């Protein structure tokens, strides 16, 4: 066993931060999109989006935008591209549009703009949700990557949004750092 001297400890504490460390230390940025025809028309109060924003902010994320869109795939595709390519947020959460209704097209719009699939996140949400309700198997939500942005579809109800984020939020940091280019060791903890 090697003994570390007090001087070595002080020297290591005085090391300058590398750009990689600086990227790790700045807060993750996020955007939240609620998909709801009634919400977009002002006929229903959105509780899901604010629930997601609150949880993200409590976890230290900087939420850049939160808004409601009607269940129109083309509008969602346009906004996902803008948030990933122009605003360059680390994380986009969508809420709603993941069920079996004919208007539920969030997964299709999300896949249409994806560079890569990240299925484990959506699978994990369904697995954990299945412990609460057997209806979890009816969720069609997906998780994908576009450039440096992770995009995750969440269910539409405020309760399901809180539960889903509760399952995954603690585990996203490492993946988001990798997307930023500031984490290289998948096995490192």
Model-found features: residue ranges?
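Non-catalytic beta/alpha edge segments that cap or flank active sites
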Residues: 1-189
């Amino acid at each position: 066993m090697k003994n570390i001297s007090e001087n070595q400890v002080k020297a290591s504490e005085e090391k300058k931060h590398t750009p990689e460390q600086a990227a790790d230390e700045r807060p993750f940025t996020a955007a939240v999109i609620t998909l709801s025809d009634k919400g977009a028309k002002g006929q229903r109060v959105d509780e899901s989006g604010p629930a997601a924003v609150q949880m993200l902010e409590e976890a230290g994320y900087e939420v850049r935008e939160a808004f409601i869109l009607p269940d129109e795939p083309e509008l969602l595709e346009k906004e996902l591209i803008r948030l990933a390519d122009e605003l360059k947020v680390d994380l986009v959460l969508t809420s709603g549009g993941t069920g079996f209704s004919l208007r539920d097209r969030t997964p299709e719009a999300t896949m249409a703009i994806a560079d890569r699939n990240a299925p484990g996140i959506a699978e994990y949400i369904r697995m954990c949700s299945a412990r609460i309700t057997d209806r979890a198997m009816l969720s069609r939500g997906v998780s994908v990557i576009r450039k440096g942005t992770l995009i995750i579809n969440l269910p539409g109800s405020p309760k399901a949004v809180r539960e889903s984020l509760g399952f995954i939020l603690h585990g996203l940091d490492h993946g988001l750092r990798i997307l930023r280019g500031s984490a290289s060791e998948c096995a490192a903890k």
